[in-house]
Amino acid sequence: DRKEIMVIKKAVYVWVIGILGMISFAACSSASQGEVPSTSNAALDNIFARKSVRAYLDKEVEKEKIDWMLRAGMAAPSGKDIRPWEFVLVTDRVALDSMAAALPYAKMLTQARYAIVVCGDVAQSSYWYLDCSAAAQNILLAAEAQGLGAVWTAAYPYEDRITVVRQYTELPGNIVPLCVIPFGYPATAQEPKQKFDEKKIHYDKF
């Protein structure tokens, strides 16, 4: 009768809710144990998929993809909207190899056809490195979103590295290189790391 049908429907509903809860719990548990989470949001998925890629194919990257990376860099937040960033796209083989030889953590430049040097204008802002760091992150995410691999290699605040980058990009005195980002098509498949750590989160007070 109708009462029995209602009881069955309620039981099925409770069962379905329980199963969904178990699936959700399992997904959260696996993510916390090392698996990168998958969401229904393309922007979040791209953030979680980003990884540092240090080996590249000897393959040309389309100009359109490079343009999107640079546009993404310029879409970064900037204090007082000053936008003190400058970008140098390096494709010269001699410059790439020379920087690879002189910079301690940029040896992958020998494999890369391209690198973007993210710079800041110290005459425009004392906090240029903050804005330029946001720009660099956007560039890395744009590379990931387009099937490219990239890695952040630091120049600032190391004077010896800054001097090397200045030498091969001919930067004027007011322009300081923050980082060099080699990029290209990844030579091998690489899985992103799961970096979420709940212990790093504090509420109201540390």
Locations of regions flagged by a protein language model:
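Acidic, surface-exposed loops and disordered segments
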Residues: V7-A11, W15, I23-F206
